[in-house]
């Protein structure tokens, strides 16, 4: 089973987030990045292979650091956190090959993440993790992504992800919308599925793609499929502190 849990938004959330008049009409179609030309600029997104437990999506934000969803670090059946060495980041994976393969040396979930929470909003909050690779990835064609400020309602974002039935190459949805949000969760019109957990959400300005959020879950609002994402601003500093503490404790 791919690590992306499905949930329905509860009345409490929809009461906070104004969805009236939201439209999916302007969303771009999902496009598969099957060639090196298609993937140029996006090879920092990779498949995160979780041993024999499936996969998630991750994104390089430094030569040795990968962002993903916190729930990807846990065995779905037992709830036990995977050992870092069980996880492999396959950067720019497409058509059976990656540009770089790296095992994971350390993995930290956001301290506020609660994997034991029931499916619902409590499980989305702080669903973000930071992985330290065993060796940095230093390739001219594979540059880490910058990060940026949290998007607001009405902003246009993009998502690059792997997923069930499209696991052989990443796909990009170049335009989807931020329907609504609060400081710990965003509702997006972006299309995601099992395996998309941890996928980076980008804002592209002046030709520069910056990661602003991480995909956590898929959901439905009034019969429309949506995705839930965790804002990155603030969370990243907390993750970096947790990773530093992990190094000191090892």
Give a label for each model feature:
Residues 2-4, 10, 20-61, 169-171, ...:
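Protease-domain processing segments flanking chymotrypsin-fold serine proteases, especially trypsin-like
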Residues 26-40, 74, 80-137:
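Conserved catalytic-core segment of clan PA serine endopeptidases
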Residues 38-41, 60-61, 81-83, 121-125, ...:
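Extracellular/periplasmic catalytic domains that process cell-envelope and extracellular macromolecules
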Residues 41-88:
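Catalytic histidine site
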Residues 59, 76-78, 110-122, 132-165:
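Active-site substrate-binding loop(s) of clan PA
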Residues 59-60, 191-215:
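Catalytic nucleophile loop of clan PA
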Residues 69-72, 212-221:
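Short beta->alpha transition motifs characteristic of CBS
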Residues 118, 185-189:
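Short, solvent-exposed secondary-structure boundary/capping segments
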